[in-house]
Amino acid sequence: RPPRAQGHEVAAISPLSGGCVARVACADLRGGERVVVKWAVAPGARLDVEAFMLRLLGTHLGDLVPRVLHDEDDLLIMSHIPNDGVRSDAGMGALGEALGRLHGVGSSAFGLDRDTLIGPLRLPNAWGDAWTDFYGERRLRAMAREAHEAGRLEASDRRRVDRLCERLG
């Protein structure tokens, strides 16, 4: 669905790389604004969940995160962040500083009020009191279970993940 469906007329569009559940393109709108558009191509893609995550990151990182302009289950329109597309020491340093700011965000518990996604995989985020329990159960074991059920992780490796999680706790 093109951005015109949301009241915008596209002057030019060019594909961007990336995305495992959606196609991504840069769109120049007739009014002069440049936006990034993602539209779902994988079954069950939830671009509205990505929009939630971008908004949450934006509360901590401001203009380093694209601003969500419109979202639906299968469509996401966000601001374009100008860049030259070249990896640099300065860019990697800025990334490190941003990650440091995120790691400085405190809370009395670990989790979120809703589950999120990483690509096509659901990330459970039920609240927990201990980081080791949260990480072991909701990241390591959850991903190992998904990978095993998809036939991408042997049962012996899943048991190894389980043993690691037991040692974490």
Annotate each language-model stretch with its function.
Residues 14-133:
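ATP-binding pocket architecture of kinase catalytic cores
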Residues 11, 65, 166-167:
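A generic local structural motif
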Residues 3-7, 61:
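A broad structural signal for alpha-helix termini and local helix breaks/kinks
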Residues 1-3, 82, 107-169:
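An alpha-helical support segment within catalytic cores of ATP-dependent transferases
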Residues 7-15:
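Conserved N-terminal boundary motif of the eukaryotic protein kinase catalytic domain
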